[in-house]
Amino acid sequence: MEVLGLFRLEVSGPMVTVALSVVFLALLKWYSTSAFSRLEKLGIRHPKPSPFIGNLAFFRQGFWESHMELRKQYGPLSGYYLGRLMFIVISEPDMIEQVLVEKFSNFTNRMATGLEPKPVADSVLFLRDKRWEEVRSVLTVAFSPEKLSEMTPLISRACDVLLAHLERHAQSGEAFDIQRTYCCYTTDVVASVAFGTEVNSQEAPEHPFVEHCRRFFASSIPKPLLVLLLSFPSIMVPLARILPNKNRDELNGFFNKLIRNVIALRDQQAAEERRRDFLQMVQDVRHSAATVGVEKFDIVRQVFSATKCPANPPRRHSPRPLSKPLSVDEVVGQAFIFLIAGYEIVTNTLSFATYLLATNPECQEKLLEEVDCFSKEHLAPEYCSLQEGLPYLDMVIKETLRMYPPAFRFTRVAAQDCEVLGQRIPAGAVLETAVGALHYDPEHWPNPENFNPERFTAEAQQRRRPYTYLPFGAGPRSCLGVRLGLLELKLTLLHILRKFRFEACPETQVPLQLESKSALGPKNGVYIRIVSR
């Protein structure tokens, strides 16, 4: 105050308030854009970000369309900001190979928001570093073809219920939204295979499991809260974790209790009495010493055997034994991920495949001929016969996943500073693979808008450039459930096409409008007619 007195200044309360307000506003203005110079420093092109929210408005139509626009405007390497978080988007095969395979040790972890609730955070999707490797190792054993073959009868039983519902639609002759029917079906499969519970969600929509699944997928973050989370993550994320959330807590509590009760019941049963489902497969390996090394984690490459091995395959690792058995929370977490993937991804892929077959009758006729020939030799299909005896069905599913990959974006986080093909990548950077932009690149896929299963003949796959087809990711952290997902898709379409054919009708939306808030799916359902054969 004495110093101020030399200049004959009097400091009043309002003046201090104004001064502090000016300082606060200046700091707020600086904060609103301070994170938005990083991409430019890296030499990565990107849309102009807005204060606080970054490029959030750029994605108002969904990530699918925006990824396509990023590729069109900025090429196979671009970036964007969601709030203060920087994303580097890649859709160039050589760079994808470096990130997912060659430099995997530096890009082991997926991005986590910090908002994942406890059961989901304990899943193999979000576990990190050493614990991820341990859990992935034992789960890779659990997802072996031998184990999956034991689950085929459970899926077939759910198919029988589905066929009964489709028969009613065939008799009516009216158009209907088959996506809604598939939603009920996949709910039944998830309940049976992952949660050890038999439901018929079409006939009993009020069943607690069905109702909680519906609430689980209907829940979302309100837009105002999303803006705050993105703009002030260091404050809002910890706050959101501790604030009460009745809906979240009720959902987590229901599924947690359900699985724990099933586990307790199974522990009292003799081994031969236990139901052979996904939950039991995970239970079997909880204390298992049977593990595999990281080089065995890439199940996707094993399934799509035509994919070439990398020039420099990952060095062999000794299997990492479990430092501690899988906790019950981790078992619950795996069932949660099965719910997310088994419901949304399988439902949408079945819907897209149905749409493509209905609007491409010549392809459907070819597939029906194959189904009829297969059915003469295999009345009750088994896992191995499904993999080997239906090559055209396999091609149809692969082309469906090229055109409409449900999991069309996935992330990896750089653990340390590095260079990828000359591009500097700082530690902590999130790299996002734009699968849709890759799958619609005419350099790799001529006439990409056309449905053409012949792209996936054995000869065509051998000629294709590696890392241009990524519906399930690639590398050691690729989709663990790819075998189970393909099994469900093949078995379901086989059962349906034995009895019915799909037909487009005036209500069929051509082309389909898409939504891509999380997984890629039809925006307005898939309306078709189904006809008995």
From Swiss-Prot:
Pfam families: p450. Coiled coil: none annotated. It is found in: Endoplasmic reticulum membrane. The chain crosses the membrane at residues 11-31, 76-96, 224-244, 336-356. Residues 32-75, 245-335 are lumenal. InterPro entries: Cyt_P450, Cyt_P450_CS, Cyt_P450_E_grp-I, Cyt_P450_sf, Cytochrome_P450_3A. One of its GO terms (cellular component) is endoplasmic reticulum membrane. Residues 1-10, 97-223, 357-533 are cytoplasmic. Heme binds at C479. Its cofactor is heme. It comes from the Eukaryota. GO terms for molecular function: 12-hydroxyheptadecatrienoic acid synthase activity; heme binding; hydroperoxy icosatetraenoate dehydratase activity; iron ion binding; monooxygenase activity; oxidoreductase activity, acting on paired donors, with incorporation or reduction of molecular oxygen; thromboxane-A synthase activity. Monomer. This is Thromboxane-A synthase. The gene is TBXAS1.
